[in-house]
Amino acid sequence: PILQRELGERFEAPAAFDKLIADGRKGKKVEKGFYRYGAAVKKGRKEVDTSVYALLGIQPSGRLSSEQISNRCMVQMLNEAVRCLEEGIIASARDGDIGAIFGIGFPPFLGGPFRYIDSLGITALVADLRRYEQQFGARFTPCNMLLSMAEEGRSFY
């Protein structure tokens, strides 16, 4: 709620979370959430608690690949990193890369979010964000700095 109040719909929690919390599904510490817990579950494996589907009134509709899942999460994080630079929260792409690696555990072999954006290509990142924006809404809208850099063919390094 705090992030949503300060930053708007980009950080709005899905309505499903309210239903899960109301049902006492707070995860591992209470052994009830999205997944099954306890002795019946093999250690190191995550099994979906299928009763969650009825609670949320949904049916699973296929599987996303690991790559699709990680890409959808990653593009939002990359967009927010650039937004931090755009808003002056960080002074440089280098500061953002160092901060992300040491502060939030961004994979060092990718060089940090800004170095990683350069390796992907800003135009490709903007295209991914636009595609997700069409599917999932404004939380995937590319920030202005990304749009202008893509238009001008610029990079961070």
Name each region found by the language model:
Residues 1-157:
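N-terminal glycine-rich phosphate-binding loop for ADP-containing cofactors
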